[in-house]
Amino acid sequence: MEDALLGAMTGPEDELGAELFGSERVFADGLALSPAGGAADRDELPVLADAYLGATEPGEPLLRALSPPPGAEVPAALLGDFPGLPELRSPDDAAPPPAYSVHVLSSLLPGARGPALLPLSAGVRVIPVEIKEAGGSVPGGSPEDAAFQAPLAQESCCKFPSSQEAEEASSCPRKKDSSPMVICQLKGGAQMLCIDNCGARELKALHLLPQYDDQSSFPQSELPKPMTTLVGRLLPVPAKLNLITQVDNGALPSAVNGAAFPSGPALQGPPKITLSGYCDCFSSGDFCNSCSCNNLRHELERFKAIKACLDRNPEAFQPKMGKGRLGAAKLRHSKGCNCKRSGCLKNYCECYEAKIMCSSICKCIACKNYEESPERKMLMSTPHYMEPGDFESSHYLSPAKFSGPPKLRKNRQAFSCISWEVVEATCACLLAQGEEAEQEHCSPSLAEQMILEEFGRCLSQILHIEFKSKGLKIE
């Protein structure tokens, strides 16, 4: 019973179908929508008013929303009824309004092999920016050429404001003289859509090179990569856009414009292995900056570099001078020195510091650290000679600082008369004098005087013996 009653009732779809396909309305002939004159009833479906779809008058046909069939001509009277729309074209030339979806022709999307249909709010990050106007306009004939020929210049820059400034800019879009725009960046940093706030008339699509750690992870596509993604209607924008994005480590990627893209060899290659030699900062004479030499955040890369060096040479970080065999008196060479200007007679020479001669495995130039070297013999025979490493600033030990060997007197004794026996006898005499002053209960000042007099007597005897041995007379 209930099913029969419900089946007899007509719904809104049946009424709409009867109105469109009735005897009074021939849908196949006119292909026009029903007029939306007057206020719509609650039972009827409302008609959306849009810049391209809208009602003119109750008795007149509407602008077709769908594309006309092939071979059909569009009457010019329909286009003349809308003088307020700028540059209104036929449905074939006019792009669809920026309403609900965007066709993204990108091969960088994961799992995509061709055009993909994405919602406008899916995977899109909105970045409000301000573009400073340039001095001249963009030359070019067609709108697409003008959009492609907008180069990146230094005099124009792209300012990324903070969140508070972005809210103020969105509330007052025409507050400043510069034309505010909104950049919608797809997730992954592959594309950027520049959208003007004042409307959807000025749309630009730009590409940004994504920063990949390894070029092997760069997604490939069988289809040719498009230069730009054309969305909506492209009009010449009298401004030059300069996009600069700074990565965390401080390096700036190369600027990319819409017309010229770097070729394959110009792309960033895999990261270089550090510690393979001197870093670029050290070779240029600067302090380390933005490199992975001494940064804890690059500890994994440093460990990999050390492991790679040890795989090539297990003794890469070992000292050049190793220990000799058990019972050996001298050290042995393990790598040798590589001196250029010092002649291997300075403390920074590994062989000289280890007190050994240079050998055939050394790579030094103009070496003077060998057994019969006159410079080395003269350096060893100098009175100011010190052991290597005893004095840090031993620049005066260089043979160039000496005019010749020191002149020695013929009557110079090879040894002195002051020996350990003489020192012990002198100390015994001083102790005996102190005990004598203590037994006599002398004052401290008198005891010091007696000890000093005894020391003078002992010293005079030593000098008398010294002068007598040299044949000198004492007056």
From Swiss-Prot:
Disruption phenotype: Male mice are infertile due to arrested spermatogenesis at the pachytene stage. InterPro entries: CRC (IPR005172), Lin-54_fam (IPR028307), Tesmin/TSO1-like_CXC (IPR033467). Residues 263-372 form the CRC domain. GO terms for biological process: cell differentiation; male meiotic nuclear division; spermatogenesis. It comes from the Eukaryota. Expressed in spermatocytes and adult heart. Also expressed in fetal brain, heart, kidney and ovary. PROSITE patterns: CRC. It is found in: Cytoplasm; Nucleus. GO terms for cellular component: cytoplasm; male germ cell nucleus; nucleus. The keyword Transmembrane does not apply. Coiled coil: none annotated. Keywords: Cytoplasm, Developmental protein, Differentiation, Meiosis, Nucleus, Phosphoprotein, Spermatogenesis. Its main location: cytoplasm. The modification Phosphoserine is found at S34, S67. PANTHER family: TESMIN, TESMIN/TSO1-RELATED. Essential for normal spermatogenesis and male fertility. Required for the completion of meiosis in male germ cells. Belongs to the lin-54 family. This is Tesmin. The gene is Tesmin.
